[in-house]
Every structure is written in structure tokens, then in C-alpha cells.
């Protein structure tokens, strides 16, 4: 397994910011849902249990369904890692001092690569391919600011 860091061209910055804002919205929803369920029942939600509550979110938010799955899985992993009932909110406001940097996770089925372009959902992003991405098999990853 190898980690590749590729740079996406700057002209896609606004679209990536919008997608990162949607990711923050889903993260905050899952965080709130999990905490309310814990208070009500005394049990933690697993990523699988949350799936029925986030069903259809990909159509509303413009994110790929595998991205929603990755957000849920990452949330549960971090909640267990830090042993917290509720994690911090992810803030999208650019003027906020506590603004969360852009993070858009994806899985293999949510991403397509062809000739220096990465297609995520219905959006194409140009990138500088210094590694020759076509030689590698991408399984998971994320767009990070």
C-alpha cells in the first residue's frame, strides 16, 4: 500500500469548498444523531446502524454514497479512538476561527481517473499527475485542503 499526494488545480477550489461544507454537514448530523441515540438508549450507534438514517443523503448533498459511508465509518472510528460520546462540530464558516479544513473522503467506486482528470460524482477535477496515477489501483482516499 502506498500513499500518493496529488495536487488538484486551483480552478476547482470553489467546488471543493462546497463539497467540504456538505461533508461537514453530514458529519455534524451523524454526530448529533449518535449523541441523541446514546442519551435515549444508552448504546452507541455503529456505522451500520446509522446507514438507514443517512439513506438518500447523497442525492440531497451532491456527495457520492460511498463518501457518506466513509464519513460514518470515520466518525465511529474517531469516537472510539478518543473515547467521547460526542465529537467536536465541523465548522464551514470561512470567517470562523475554528473553521475545519476541507476534507472529502472517497472510496474506489466513487472515483474515476482518466488522462489527468479525476471524476468524483458528476464533477471532473484536473490534477497534476506526477506519479502516473494510471499505474496504481486507488482503493480509498480523500481530498484534503
Kindly give the residue locations of the regions a language model identified.
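Nucleic-acid substrate recognition interfaces
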Residues: 1-145
Amino acid at each position: 500500500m502506498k500513499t500518493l499526494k496529488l495536487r488538484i488545480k486551483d480552478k476547482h477550489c470553489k467546488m471543493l469548498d462546497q463539497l467540504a461544507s456538505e461533508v461537514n454537514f453530514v458529519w455534524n448530523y451523524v454526530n448529533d444523531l449518535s449523541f441523541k441515540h446514546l442519551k435515549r438508549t444508552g448504546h452507541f450507534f455503529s456505522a451500520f446502524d446509522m446507514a438507514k438514517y443517512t439513506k438518500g443523503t447523497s442525492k440531497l448533498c451532491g456527495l457520492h454514497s460511498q463518501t457518506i459511508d466513509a464519513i460514518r465509518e470515520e466518525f465511529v472510528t474517531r469516537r472510539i479512538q478518543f473515547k467521547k460520546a460526542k465529537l467536536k462540530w465541523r465548522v464551514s464558516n470561512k470567517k470562523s476561527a475554528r473553521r475545519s479544513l476541507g476534507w472529502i473522503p472517497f472510496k474506489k467506486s466513487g472515483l474515476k481517473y482518466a488522462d489527468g482528470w479525476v471524476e468524483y460524482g458528476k464533477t471532473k477535477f484536473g490534477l497534476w499527475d506526477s506519479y502516473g496515477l494510471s499505474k496504481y489501483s486507488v482503493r480509498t482516499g480523500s481530498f484534503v485542503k
